[in-house]
Amino acid sequence: MFRLPHRMSRGSVAALAVAAVALSVTTNVVAARAEPAEPAGPQQRLDRLVTKTGLPGVIAAVGDADGRVRTYTSGTGDLATGEAVPADSRVRIASNTKMYTATVVLQLVEEGKVDLDATVERYLPGVVRGPGGDGRRITVRQLLQQTSGLPDYDSLVVEAGGSLGAVAHTYYEPHDLLDAALAEERHFAPGTKWEYSNTNYVVLGLLVQRVTDRPVGEEITRRIIRPLDLRDTYWPRVGEQRIRGSHPHGYLADAPGAPWEDITRMDPSLGWAAGQLVSTPADLGSFMTALVGGELLAPAQLAEMQETVRAPHFDAEPGWRYGLGLARAELDCGVVGWGHGGDIQGFETRNLVTEDGGWAVVAVTALPTSMDMVADVSDAVEDLVCAADR
């Protein structure tokens, strides 16, 4: 549903599982947008990822600055039948949803309907009040930047027994998520620290709905998905547990080495505006390219989005910085990569786009059970995007 950063930093597999309360593609390749994969370095890199980690399968899309897109798969798409991973797979992209939610908020800023430095209270009077935080002291910018101090709502999973499988078929209203977070103690004073919390983006989803008087999923669809013709990206309907169209099965394990449990059918409402979207690696790459390329935001708002702060423990690899729903890393090959990533029951996605237009998206078909596995996926994405940028 969302992204694993802060949970992973706790250093235990149990925390990893509870953490995957948060989320961070597959590649549905439409002929007009992609070319068939050719046997080369990327295929070997993904084969090695599956062999080393024991993850069931992987789907990746790689794009270069000239607009060429190639897709690759490795491993097994259905452990029960042994079928391969479909090349046109859709997956749950989890916390990558935050990039879409942030883009809508920044479009509202451009339209003069939202002020980044106004308090949450202006738009949601009386909504954010409790031990976990006070909307009168938190700004919209701090929500986007993950510096609000609002705690996450991991308690919902803990109360269900600590297993993500236990909440896989539970429907949550957005206010259920917010209420669980506000019942916890505030982690720090707003603006004094960075810490990843899905609650920030739940509040932003509520803000979008209050300002536009429309559902946040509808605004994401109207403002981003349709204009970019992302035909394999969609916001699941209320209560919708299946993944539409071609997709691999997604898996979850209780601990390293434990059997993989099929968790493909699940209710993504635990992620909502922080992690509910379904997409393909190719569509996700197209979105990131359009975002960083200035197609979705005016220069002033894109500059705000790319103004970053240190983001310790954002991912298994150090050195990340976080902007307004978009993260930045300096890669070993000497280029700057922008992206996010996400983790949810059944899937993990990592992605990067460079300012030169090269990009890579990798989705694995199980939630990793160790920090080493997360690092392996992140390393694979970096290798692919660096090769694409040459």
What are the functions of these language-model segments?
Residues 53-56, 80-141, 188-197, 272:
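Short active-site loop at a secondary-structure junction
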Residues 131-336:
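Short, surface-exposed loop or secondary-structure junction motifs
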Residues 1-35:
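Secretory targeting and sorting signals
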Residues 2-6, 31-73, 212, 259-390:
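Catalytic loop of the DD-peptidase/beta-lactamase superfamily, centered on the K-T-G motif
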Residues 38, 42, 93, 97, ...:
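Hydrophobic (often cysteine-bearing) scaffold residues that line and stabilize catalytic clefts
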Residues 71, 80-83, 152-154, 335:
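Short, solvent-exposed loop/turn elements at domain surfaces
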Residues 77-79, 148-149:
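Solvent-exposed coil/turn segments that connect beta secondary-structure elements
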Residues 46, 60, 66-67, 98-101, ...:
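Residue-level preference for non-acidic, small/hydrophobic
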